[in-house]
Design a protein with these regions (language model features):
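Carbohydrate-interacting regions of secretory-pathway proteins
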Residues: 21-233
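Bacterial N-terminal signal peptides
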Residues: 7-16
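Positively charged n-region of N-terminal signal peptides that target proteins for export
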Residues: 1-5
Length: 233
């Protein structure tokens, strides 16, 4: 699905809300800048996540995730992130499981990757292995817009390096995910095997900071029970 079509779809959704008297969607904070309220630790430790000076700090150890309290279906996620270490690895999962059953400690879902720019050099990976890759993780499958195997690579490298803030705008509608990095849409996947689930922030070996985490919930679509992840216990 092209970006223009997706934007039109969102526009129609908003117009529908106005025409039918439904509350017009707006961005609402997922992080209050003071506490971890609204988030649930899944499989990390009490020292993994903390708040300092309005910033959500992730130590990077152990590997695992923290999830949102509720599930989301159609939405726009706005999030800023900054790596503190060269080659740092992290990400945010959308439409994710609320529990982890995999040996590598990460959930099934659609991952929006956040890699520090030196990652390919430090770990001797291909240049395409950079921030902004999108892919189905675990049991979740997607169709990449810009294939690198099962992953979708960004068409333009726009992320800033360690010590600098980056902004992701993640649009998730009816199994389609589109990613804007620092003000420009550069990647997408479609045909996700799940269309409703949790948001998860990832701890994966390096300190990373998050701030200004907001979500705009959009009207729901037609969805099968098999496309909704189970409620976490």
């Amino acid at each position: 699905m092209k970006i223009g079509i997706l934007v039109q779809m969102i526009g129609w959704m908003l117009l529908h809300c106005v025409a039918t008297g439904i509350e017009t969607p707006e961005f609402k904070p997922l992080f209050d800048g003071k506490t971890l309220d609204g988030w649930v630790d899944v499989n990390t430790s009490p020292d993994t996540w903390s708040v300092k000076d309005g910033v959500l700090v992730c130590s990077g150890t152990p590997i695992g995730v923290m999830r949102s309290e509720k599930q989301y279906e159609n939405f726009i996620l706005s999030i800023e992130w900054m790596h503190l270490e060269a080659g740092g690895n992290s990400g945010v999962f959308v439409w994710s499981e609320g529990e982890v059953f995999r040996e590598n400690r990460l959930p099934s879902g659609v991952e929006v990757q956040m890699l520090e720019n030196d990652y390919p050099k430090i770990y001797n990976r291909v240049r395409e292995y950079v921030s902004g890759e999108l892919f189905g993780a675990g049991t979740v499958t997607t169709i990449p817009d810009h294939p690198r195997g099962k992953r979708s690579s960004s068409v333009e490298y726009r992320c800033k390096g360690k010590g600098e803030w980056n902004h992701y705008l993640v649009v998730c509608v009816d199994g389609v995910v589109k990613l804007s990095i620092n003000g420009k849409f550069v990647n997408g996947v479609r045909g996700s095997s799940v269309k409703k689930g949790y948001l998860c922030l990832e701890s994966e070996g390096a300190q990373i900071h998050f701030r200004n985490i907001e979500i705009m919930e959009l009207p729901p679509g037609v969805i099968k029970a098999s496309e909704i992840v189970p409620l976490a216990k």
